[in-house]
Amino acid sequence: MTKKYLKVDVVSPLGSVFKGEADMVSLRGSAGEMGIVYGHTELLSTLPAGVVNVRKGQHTDVLYVSGGIVEVTPTRVTIMVDDMERAENLNQAEAEKARARAKEVLKNPDASKLDIEAANKRLKEADARLKALNSSNGLYYSKDD
């Protein structure tokens, strides 16, 4: 029997940013962690900023996504995002600086509600970048200090 793979497509406003096949796609959706394999039931979910793992055999592509929507059919996973980066292209120092800057805004008692919302978003994105970077290196990253 021939092995059946999921078709995986990550698209941004710029077009397709990742195409591949997978034994399994793992990600965090609105209802929590999901592992998606060939034959999965159809679903549509929102995604927070986070990590998407696309595994085929012994190889795993680790992707940072800025958040978006995932559509699953029995044979395909389509992820629509504003931004996506492969973990190996992420810069740890930049992500740590972004995290520190966001935390500084959150500590400021004079920060506006708009500044606080933007800082919370940037903090979640920086945490997701660090998690993607560290998980691609076989490390565990916790956003808690």
Curated annotation (Swiss-Prot):
What are the GO MF terms of this UniProt record?
Answer: ATP binding; proton-transporting ATP synthase activity, rotational mechanism
Task: Tell me where the transmembrane regions lie.
Answer: none
Q: Where in the cell is it found?
A: Cell inner membrane
Q: Do you know which CDD domains this protein is assigned to? A: F1-ATPase_delta
What membrane topology was assigned to this protein in its record?
A: Peripheral membrane protein
Just give the chief location class: membrane
Any coiled-coil regions, as ranges: none
Q: Which UniProt keywords apply?
A: ATP synthesis, Cell inner membrane, Cell membrane, CF(1), Hydrogen ion transport, Ion transport, Membrane, Transport
Q: Which GO terms describe its cellular component?
A: plasma membrane; proton-transporting ATP synthase complex
Q: Which InterPro entries match?
A: ATP_synth_F1_dsu/esu, ATP_synth_F1_dsu/esu_N, ATPsynth_dsu/esu_N
| Protein family | Belongs to the ATPase epsilon chain family.
The entry describes its oligomerization and partners as: F-type ATPases have 2 components, CF(1) - the catalytic core - and CF(0) - the membrane proton channel. CF(1) has five subunits: alpha(3), beta(3), gamma(1), delta(1), epsilon(1). CF(0) has three main subunits: a, b and c.
Q: What does this protein do?
A: Produces ATP from ADP in the presence of a proton gradient across the membrane.
Protein name per Swiss-Prot or TrEMBL: ATP synthase epsilon chain
